[in-house]
Amino acid sequence: MTDAELLELYRRMVLLRVFDERALVYHRQGRIGTYAIAWNHEAIQAGATFALGEDDWIFPSYRESPIGLVRGMPPATILQWWRGHPSGWWNPLDWNVASICVPIATHVPHAAGLAWGTCVAIGTQIEATFQSSGFHQPEG
């Protein structure tokens, strides 16, 4: 990786962390409802989106809600989604980011369906899913 690419990757990680910290403050103030923090997930989210192309799709789970930021989604849209406000709904085609799924792994069939369809139609597109914490983690 070049120095410029490393800087961009770092910028994305900081963007995700700052958003996450602000969203947690809003949650504690009662401005948004439930919010699942994504601390320590920044490198995974930033690295994956950095490796994906613009035409590739992202299917985030609840801890990856800030991931749309690195695709250009306005922060207010994500915050409004957590409030359940209609202005928090987005067209997935605008950023190739599917709606956030809170129940763990419920977005996997959607990603698989899109992957199958694009494989048949295009053949070169990637659909990335994120499972957050808790999915297939050992207990104990």
Residue ranges: model-predicted function:
Residues 6:
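Active-site-adjacent structural elements in enzyme catalytic domains
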Residues 18-140:
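Cofactor-binding active-site loop characterized by glycine-rich and histidine/acidic residues
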Residues 1-2:
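Charged, compositionally biased N-terminal leader segments and the immediate start
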